[in-house]
Amino acid sequence: MKQELARIEQFLDALWLEKNLAENTLNAYRRDLSMMVEWLHHRGLTLATAQSDDLQALLAERLEGGYKATSSARLLSAVRRLFQYLYREKFREDDPSAHLASPKLPQRLPKDLSEAQVERLLQAPLIDQPLELRDKAMLEVLYATGLRVSELVGLTMSDISLRQGVVRVIGKGNKERLVPLGEEAVYWLETYLEHGRPWLLNGVSIDVLFPSQRAQQMTRQTFWHRIKHYAVLAGIDSEKLSPHVLRHAFATHLLNHGADLRVVQMLLGHSDLSTTQIYTHVATERLRQLHQQHHPRA
């Protein structure tokens, strides 16, 4: 089994070099594929001998055992990529994953905040404190640009141009995009850079735009805790929250105000338009609710 796990590490190294996948994705693949190797081992199977029926049985067992459909989809993606790699590297003469059936994924609408709720969230930080001034700037940038949290905390000083009012983002797959900041976000960035960031750095020289209290790069988890803190202050139900709550609000509110779907796709950094289209369902649902509330024949 050690050889099997070593082969998985070789595959993950190759995947990182070819696709530049995020560390979180690689770690998830490692967990899924290690579980698969153990599952095969208990049945007297290996990566060299497993057949399509065996892999389909694994996926079915995961689903029946309460595995979420999204987790099963990720497992399937990892399995397919692994066996494609093994076939390409001549370790196998076939690809048993080629005809595996995909689990049906329920279409989950993004958690959505109204414009009034977003406004309350943005007003929650106390701007006379350097730490909360940083958070205020981060929230404003997040809502103005629709960045992923990982993209936001990874920003450097060289990524922003306040004169041009844009931010350069390196997104998934190492793809670069330029996103407008808007006047409000530029104002709060200027204020933070003058009155907040120097206090946080306390003489330390780093290029990170939004450093932590220890003058290091902030983690996604830390910022998520900050968002929850301000949501409580703003009186927002925790069930409406997710780490990407302002990214979702950014997309939905743009569409509500008539933005073109492809423009929103470009701003979000989605490679596939279908990923962006889910936000149209949120916007349509909001219109349906308003119609029911206000139309005399609804």
From Swiss-Prot:
Keywords: Cell cycle, Cell division, Chromosome partition, Cytoplasm, DNA integration, DNA recombination, DNA-binding
Location relative to the cell: Cytoplasm
SUPFAM superfamilies attached to this UniProt entry: DNA breaking-rejoining enzymes, lambda integrase-like, N-terminal domain
UniProt record similarity statement: Belongs to the 'phage' integrase family. XerD subfamily.
The organism of origin for this protein: Shigella flexneri
Disulfide bonds: none
Top-level taxon in the UniProt lineage: Bacteria
Domain called Tyr recombinase: residue spans: 108-292
Primary localization class, coarse: cytoplasm
Full protein name: Tyrosine recombinase XerD
Chain's role: Site-specific tyrosine recombinase, which acts by catalyzing the cutting and rejoining of the recombining DNA molecules. Binds cooperatively to specific DNA consensus sequences that are separated from XerC binding sites by a short central region, forming the heterotetrameric XerC-XerD complex that recombines DNA substrates. The complex is essential to convert dimers of the bacterial chromosome into monomers to permit their segregation at cell division. It also contributes to the segregational stability of plasmids. In the complex XerD specifically exchanges the bottom DNA strands.
GO biological process terms held by the UniProt record: cell division; chromosome segregation; DNA transposition
Regulation: FtsK may regulate the catalytic switch between XerC and XerD in the heterotetrameric complex during the two steps of the recombination process.
CC annotations in GO: cytoplasm
Catalytic residues of the enzyme: 148, 172, 244, 247, 270, 279
Annotated GO MF terms: DNA binding; tyrosine-based site-specific recombinase activity
Description of how the protein assembles with itself and partners: Forms a cyclic heterotetrameric complex composed of two molecules of XerC and two molecules of XerD, in which XerC interacts with XerD via its C-terminal region, XerD interacts with XerC via its C-terminal region and so on.
All copies of domain Core-binding (CB), residue ranges: 2-87
